[in-house]
């Protein structure tokens, strides 16, 4: 049961349930457009998975461990002596990570206040499509009413049915981000973005990391050229890859380690047993809708539990909208959720709102990084699209040579008839930054010649994007 702490005379125009990247951005944008807005977040800290236990803390650890690895592996070539003597204090590394996270979460709370968004710390559940009960973290219940509600509750890690998370030995991404000591042996089940990034963190600090993957290759949605380059680089940095078709058994031991028996793909599918003291399960994420009361209010979900939405983020129930990881549209990425939050708020304010799902980048923050947008070569072949390929390696790029970050390449795919850019795939130390130029080009329908004839600063790694585009419509100059 719920109780109203005060009479509701003036309902909110918009209540956003969830304060992650999609939710808090939607709330701020709605308020900026003149709508009376509230945001409800049960975590007690804004920013969602991304800021608290995802994108941001993982980047903090990736940065710290890259500096450590770089000191040991590369400093002497720059004439910086003594790098091999650098040590890592994991506790201090974790403290710095938390400092970054706390600063950003408090910053988001300030932004809500600045934009006059009412912030409720608690768990929201639908009583009716226009009434929400908020169970406050202070133990009090409060009913709030809204003309429109945006569901932005995000997602949570998926556990294997026979292997629940204990966050000590069997880890989700949350547990892997919080380790206080380096595992001697880590097995990562799932060779996607999360598994590869967090495997890299602990491999750089000396853990023996093995990534096992059900698909024929790690990061199976990437262009195959990109995957091959990435896997090769990770192996050189201490991560092994084992393809498998199944898991036959998992056995615990009394010394805090486990034995994992895998059915390995090659050599006739024989069983192989891997021992580890940390098992990271990164087999995907599932939408988080527990306690929302969607079923009793007849909000439609698909067979996997995602909220079904239409072209304007509307559910089948009037006044109820949904964005981000919880919906059945687009990749489960923070920046996708942010764009949906802006577009949904604009629509609720009576303005046009749109997300171009064909131009949403994906980045893996390993070293080298991988960034992709648009179609892969495999997708174009499958669709029967006539296309051209332009590639340029970073070992022919002046800036990359000067700073000894020569791994990788840029690959551009264009329509053979029109020269319009259909996909861009980058492997290099700064791929996540370089992809921005490709996004802008694709968003505005640019051709490879448009980019190839645009003057790029020298020496920069962005020149590799220009040269790859030149390879599509003419020839490269520097390779």
Swiss-Prot record:
One Pfam family here: Pyr_redox_2
Alphabetized UniProt keyword annotations: Disulfide bond, FAD, Flavoprotein, NAD, Oxidoreductase, Redox-active center
Active site feature: 458
Entry-linked PROSITE patterns: PYRIDINE_REDOX_1
Residues that coordinate or bind FAD: 41-50, 59, 124, 153-155, 325, 332-335
GO cellular-component term (any): cytoplasm
Misc: The active site is a redox-active disulfide bond.
Protein name: Dihydrolipoyl dehydrogenase
């Amino acid at each position: 049961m719920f109780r109203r702490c005060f009479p509701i005379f003036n309902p909110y125009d918009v209540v956003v349930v969830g304060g992650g990247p999609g939710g808090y951005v939607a709330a701020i944008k709605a308020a900026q457009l003149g709508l009376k807005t509230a945001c409800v977040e049960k975590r007690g800290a804004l920013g969602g998975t991304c800021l608290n236990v995802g994108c941001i803390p993982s980047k903090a650890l990736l940065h710290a461990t890259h500096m450590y690895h770089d000191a040991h592996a590369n400093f002497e070539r720059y004439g910086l002596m003594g790098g091999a003597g650098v040590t890592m204090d994991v506790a201090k590394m974790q403290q710095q990570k938390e400092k970054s996270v706390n600063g950003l979460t408090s910053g988001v709370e300030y932004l809500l206040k600045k934009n006059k968004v009412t912030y409720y710390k608690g768990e929201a559940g639908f009583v009716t499509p226009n009434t929400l009960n908020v169970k406050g973290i202070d133990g009090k219940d409060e009913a709030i009413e809204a003309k429109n509600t945006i569901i932005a509750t995000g997602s949570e890690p998926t556990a294997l049915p026979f292997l629940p998370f204990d966050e000590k030995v069997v880890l989700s991404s949350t547990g892997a981000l919080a380790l206080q000591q380096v595992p001697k042996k880590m097995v990562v089940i799932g060779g996607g973005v999360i598994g590869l990034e967090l495997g890299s963190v602990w491999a750089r600090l000396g853990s023996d990391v093995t990534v096992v993957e059900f698909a024929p290759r790690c990061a199976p949605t990437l262009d195959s050229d990109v995957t091959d380059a990435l896997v090769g680089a990770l192996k050189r940095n201490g991560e092994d890859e084992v393809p498998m078709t199944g898991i036959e058994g998992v056995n615990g031991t009394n010394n805090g380690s486990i034995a994992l028996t895998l059915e390995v793909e090659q050599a006739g599918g024989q069983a192989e047993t891997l021992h580890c003291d940390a098992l990271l399960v990164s087999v995907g994420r599932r939408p988080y809708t527990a306690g929302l009361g969607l079923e009793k209010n007849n909000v439609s979900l698909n067979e996997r539990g995602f909220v079904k939405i239409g072209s304007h983020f509307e559910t089948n129930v009037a006044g109820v909208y949904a964005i981000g990881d919880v919906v059945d549209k687009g990749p489960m990425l923070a920046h996708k959720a942010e764009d949906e939050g802006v577009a949904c708020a604009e629509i609720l304010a009576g303005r046009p709102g749109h997300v171009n799902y064909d131009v949403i980048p994906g980045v893996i923050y390993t070293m080298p990084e991988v960034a992709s947008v648009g179609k892969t070569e495999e997708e174009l072949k499958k669709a029967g699209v006539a296309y051209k390929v332009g590639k340029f390696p970073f070992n022919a790029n002046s800036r990359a040579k000067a700073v000894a970050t020569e791994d990788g390449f840029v690959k551009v795919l264009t329509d053979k008839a029109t020269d319009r850019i259909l996909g861009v795939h980058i492997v290099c130390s700064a791929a996540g930054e370089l992809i921005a130029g490709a996004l802008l080009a694709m968003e505005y329908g640019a051709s490879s010649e448009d980019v190839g004839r645009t003057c790029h600063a020298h020496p920069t790694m962005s020149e590799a994007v220009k040269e790859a585009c030149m390879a599509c419509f003419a020839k490269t100059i520097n390779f």
